[in-house]
Every structure is written in structure tokens, then in C-alpha cells.
């Protein structure tokens, strides 16, 4: 294998695929990145794969001799990133050898790799017709829901985001058992096929990161087959296992009607919560929200035993009887930050039943939070 490529492009590509390299590999080759040079296409392909998440990208290169080898991702990335950006890099490896030489204007480095045949095959599962997704719509769906997925591996299915596609659009949903975020998106796909799959949050965080930094507006092709999902666009591929099982019927958790509704300024509520959260963090992360229909106010308070207490009040349009309800402040803050509207609606029935927060001017996003029971 012998090729010449741009230092900047190689360094950038290595940073992308290294995010799929195993931090604690079960086999030495999983700590490596696979390099595949093709003289026919004039491309250098890089692949990182930890047996769960795989990322593949390619860059243009002047390939004199085709070939493939794996190199230690961390060491290779650190060497390349420190090479002069204004000088091309030459990579060369003799047939049958595991020694790779990197050469630039600043000098040369030798690295020992492992055979490409030792690297596990990336499960691309690209059979059938792909589902075409609008990348901007997909990014919006992921940003609105990823934060609500569970970090508890014991809740296997809840550690992912559920993606559902039908003739009405794409629906992204995530829940950790304490809160639920759902975003319904129209005109998400040019395909007529339906989709019903749950993908690990870690994989989708990397997908959102990659799509956000992409150039161009190519549609994302989604393949789903035999426990694998593959997202492909431009010269990049992300593959992930899907999560087994039937995702909870989250729609039945959302109340059909509400006896109490409040409308408040989102940024005002967010700021007040962040200030009161300083005290809530000292104890149990619980804040109490109390509505006052007569005064047209919503008060936010926290009481940290043996530390102190604090409260603030903001203006609110209140309908229904007064109510006091308690939440984990982090859940409410994260939900409000996922919204972009000026006004937010808070809808509830009783201090112990689910509360729904939604943007005043956007019915596509629903955020449900379970309250915390407090002793009076």
C-alpha cells in the first residue's frame, strides 16, 4: 500500500472514526482503525468499529498501490494531528508487512499495525430499498429527544431513542421511566416505507454530531435489517446494532385532557429554575412549583434542609385551581432547553399525575415529566 493525502483531511477523518474505537477493547485489533486504499477510486477509507457502533469515512488520495492495514487509533491520530498542515502525508507499507511508514516535510515515523483481515467486518446491512431522511429534520428529532433516554444499562430498551416513520412523518421518542420526550416531524422522508426501530442513544449522539458537521445537504439513507441499522450519506457511514424488544406504548402515558394549565415565559422560567436549582442541588434536586390563579403567578421554591431555602415568582396565565407540584429540577431544565419557543404551556391534573410541558406555538413537541411526591 502506498498513497499521498492531505494532513488536514486525514486528521479530521481520524477524529471522526476514532469515536467508534473501543475504549476498553476485548481484542487488540478493536483499538485500531482500518485503512483501505483503493487506486481505482483514488480514495482512502477509514473505519472504526467496537462491535456495537461503527463509523466509516473516506477522503481523496493519490493511491499508487492499493492495500489495507489497521493501525492503533490513538497513536496514529496523535502523530497525524501534530504533523504540519501545509504538507501532504505519504503512507507506505510493503506487501505482507505490518510496518507502516508515515512521511511528511517534518520527518518520518514508523508504526506497527495489524493485518486488515483481523479487523471485524462492518455489518453494513444495505439490502433492499433505503429509507431517505432529511438530515436537518433528523438532527432536530435527535436533539429534542436524546437527553430523555436512560443511562441505566439495566433498562436496555430505554437506553435508546425510538424512531417511527409512517405516512404522517417521523416520530422520535425517548424515555427513562421518569420523563418522556416526543417530537413529531412532517415531511421527514421521501420514502413510502414504514420504520419502527430503537437505536442506542450513544450511536445516535454520534450520528447527530456527524450530521451537524457535514457539508452539503445530501439525504440520509437508512437501512434496517436483522438487528442492524445503517445511516449513509455523502462519503460517510454509521452502523449500529438496534435494541431488541417492543418499545413501550408511550402515547398512552400522555393524558387526553387537563384540569389545570399555565402559560409562562420559557426563558423566565428557565432562569428562575437555574437560580433556585443552586439550593435544590444541595439536597435532593427537588423544586416545588406553586400556581396562584388570583395573582397570576407561578412560584418556584427549593428547601435544602440544614442549608437554606429560596423562592422566586414569575408571571403566568393560570387556568384551573391552584396547585403545588414538585419535580426533579434537572428533568424540567432539560425539557425547557429542548424547546425553542418564547412561551411554554404547563398542563397537569393533580400533584401526583404526569405533567406535560409543550411549546405554546408548536404542537409537534411533547415533554412529559412525572412529579415527585413530597411530604406536607
Residue map of PLM features:
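Structural preference for solvent-exposed beta-strand-turn elements
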Residues: 1-376
